[in-house]
């Protein structure tokens, strides 16, 4: 990880901080806290999530959704608001580089225990909490527009963005407050002591332009899980993932984040350490199930909104606009657009009546999907491609496996070529532990294009030395069925996604445990049909051996069944 993220890790950790809010007379580590991004250490300037300010708004949370509400001045909050920011020092070590180490653990900061001697330090101590003031609250109008399109209307009741688990009791008022504050952020001025003023400011941060990071690109999230709780342990915790989907400034990543990381920075590897976005909601729930995505707001439009807001405020505050980080441009010497991996554009949307799912083109006029997406042979289906431009082509199901077949596969012949859709190279071998990605239309369907999720190939299940099932740790959701599974290293097509895992006893779904059909099972038959239109090879799939059927029924072979002890 350090080889890929070395520079970005340093930038992320130097930019990370924790923000806590309390009422006058209460402990500094109050009940409201989140993560933040340090824009300047001297003078102190921090951007954090706005949700912690809802209890202090003079006009209540309804002011956040008022018509035309783009920013609110600092005096929108009550006078009893007390803010504190905590970050790690950036003092250079003996070698001239910034030291890196988790701060020494002092138990009373974590769990209200009797004071005692701190444990031996494993790094540098944290800075003491610094007082701060609210300069303004701001939102990104374009973020809200795309949020309403994706999560509003009839789907609104299915979605929750609460940091609480689905079984935790959260009042309707609290949930409404959280939703109103979802896309709001806060700009804070940090009051520094003489020691902090003299501290090294650290390298300048730059912001990645909107649209410069492609789907599937690796991302690094830096936040403080659980906010003000135990910063000795949790301050600036890192999480890796990829950019899963994009809708204007609304971004999704499969990096796993926890409550308290709201407002944390999201960084890219190219250019190293450029700020891409800030965390909006670390946990997303749909129909009571954890989706496995973290909701982000792109940094570039957010900083543009901050500049506009600062210029409307008194001159002393407006001068802070010069401290906001610039967007990546010519000085960095890198192109502003990255086409990303070719395989990220390989998935297509397959619609059969009211049913839809994913698919992958294996030839210009041949698409593979799942039987439960297109179950009937000769059925008419509509295949949509969204990259690089949206096209819709009618096709016909020429083959679908029988219900009793363990391989859930259907093959669609198209009336026209799928232009500009990359045809993947089928893999010949599989390597457990290799980095992989899934591309599919899960969760959003055609409203947001295909999503990319990352993980590893966790298992290759074989029967008589032949791979018959692949398992991955990628997040797979309803609608991803039929989508492609790719090797990140080679870009080759490894398999076809068929399902995630569901516990029939509890009803819980596990998106990070899923199953794919190895492409080596399908490739000879697909090649035969593509060349000769002969379905004989595909028909052989219906005659899969009993050991293969046992594997796909998730049963233990009879020879391995436990013997009775009676």
UniProtKB/Swiss-Prot annotation:
Region annotation Serine protease: where it falls in the sequence: 319-531
Enzyme class, UniProt record, top EC level: hydrolase
GO cellular component, one term: peroxisome
Keywords, sorted A to Z: Hydrolase, Peroxisome, Protease, Serine protease
Main subcellular localisation: other
Site (Cleavage) residue list: 110-111
Entry annotation: catalytic residues: 372, 408, 481
Coiled-coil regions, chain positions: none
Entries under InterPro entries matching the protein: Pept_S1A_Tysnd1, Peptidase_S1_PA, TYSND1/DEG15
Intracellular or extracellular location(s): Peroxisome
GO biological process: protein processing; proteolysis; regulation of fatty acid beta-oxidation
EC number(s) recorded for this UniProt protein: 3.4.21.-
Family note: Belongs to the peptidase S1B family.
Role noted for this protein: Peroxisomal protease that mediates both the removal of the leader peptide from proteins containing a PTS2 target sequence and processes several PTS1-containing proteins. Catalyzes the processing of PTS1-proteins involved in the peroxisomal beta-oxidation of fatty acids.
Assembly: Homodimer. Forms a heterodimer with the C-terminal cleavage product (45 kDa form). Forms a heterodimer with the N-terminal cleavage product (15 kDa form). Interacts with PEX5. Interacts with LONP2.
Protein name in UniProt: Peroxisomal leader peptide-processing protease
């Amino acid at each position: 990880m350090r080889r890929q993220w070395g520079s970005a890790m340093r930038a992320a950790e130097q930019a990370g901080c924790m923000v806590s809010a309390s009422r006058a007379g209460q402990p500094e580590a109050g009940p409201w806290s989140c993560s933040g991004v340090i824009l300047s250490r001297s003078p102190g300037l921090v951007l954090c999530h706005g949700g912690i300010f809802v209890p202090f708004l003079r006009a209540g949370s309804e002011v956040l959704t008022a018509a035309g509400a783009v920013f609110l001045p600092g005096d929108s909050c009550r006078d009893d608001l007390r803010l504190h920011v905590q970050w790690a020092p950036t003092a250079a070590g003996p070698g001239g580089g910034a030291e890196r180490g988790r701060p020494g653990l002092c138990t009373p900061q974590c769990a209200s225990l009797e004071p005692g001697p701190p444990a031996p330090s494993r790094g540098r101590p944290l800075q003491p909490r610094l007082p701060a003031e609210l300069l303004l609250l701001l939102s990104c109008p374009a973020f809200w527009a795309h949020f309403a399109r994706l999560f509003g209307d009839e789907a609104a009741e299915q979605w929750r963005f609460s940091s609480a688990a689905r079984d935790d009791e959260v009042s309707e008022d609290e949930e409404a407050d959280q939703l109103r504050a979802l896309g709001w952020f806060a700009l804070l001025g940090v009051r520094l002591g003489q020691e902090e003023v003299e501290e090294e400011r650290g390298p300048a941060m730059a912001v990645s332009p909107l649209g410069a990071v492609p789907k599937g690109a690796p991302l690094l999230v830096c936040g403080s899980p659980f906010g003000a709780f135990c910063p000795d342990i949790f301050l600036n915790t890192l999480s890796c993932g990829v950019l899963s989907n994009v809708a204007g400034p609304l971004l999704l990543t499969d990096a796993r984040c926890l409550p308290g990381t709201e407002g944390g920075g999201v960084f890219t590897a190219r250019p190293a350490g450029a700020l891409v976005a800030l965390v909006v909601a670390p946990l997303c729930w749909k129909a009571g199930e954890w989706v496995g995505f973290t909701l982000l707001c792109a940094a570039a439009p957010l900083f543009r909104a901050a500049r506009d807001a600062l210029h409307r405020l008194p001159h002393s505050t407006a001068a802070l606009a010069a401290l906001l980080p610039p967007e990546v441009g010519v000085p960095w010497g890198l192109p502003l657009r990255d086409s990303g991996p070719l395989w990220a554009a390989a998935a297509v949307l397959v619609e059969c009546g009211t049913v839809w799912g994913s698919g992958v083109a294996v030839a210009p006029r041949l698409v593979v999907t799942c039987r439960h997406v297109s179950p009937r042979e000769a059925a008419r289906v509509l295949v949509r491609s969204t990259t690089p431009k949206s096209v819709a082509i009618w096709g016909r199901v020429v083959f679908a496996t029988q219900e009793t077949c363990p391989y859930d596969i259907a093959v669609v012949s198209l009336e026209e070529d799928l232009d500009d859709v990359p045809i993947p190279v089928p893999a010949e071998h599989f390597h457990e532990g290799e980095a992989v990605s899934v591309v599919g239309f899960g969760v959003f369907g055609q409203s947001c294009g295909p999503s990319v999720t990352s993980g590893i190939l966790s298992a290759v299940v074989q029967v008589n030395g032949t791979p018959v099932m692949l398992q991955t740790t990628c997040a797979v959701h309803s609608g991803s069925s039929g989508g492609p599974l790719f090797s990140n290293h080679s870009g080759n097509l490894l398999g076809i996604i068929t399902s995630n895992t569901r516990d029939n006893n509890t009803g819980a779904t596990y998106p990070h445990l899923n199953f794919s059909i190895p492409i080596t099972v399908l490739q000879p038959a697909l090649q035969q049909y593509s060349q000769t239109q002969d379905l004989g090879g595909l028909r052989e799939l219906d005659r899969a051996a009993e050991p293969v059927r046992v594997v796909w029924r998730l049963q233990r072979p009879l020879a391995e069944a436990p013997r009775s002890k009676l």
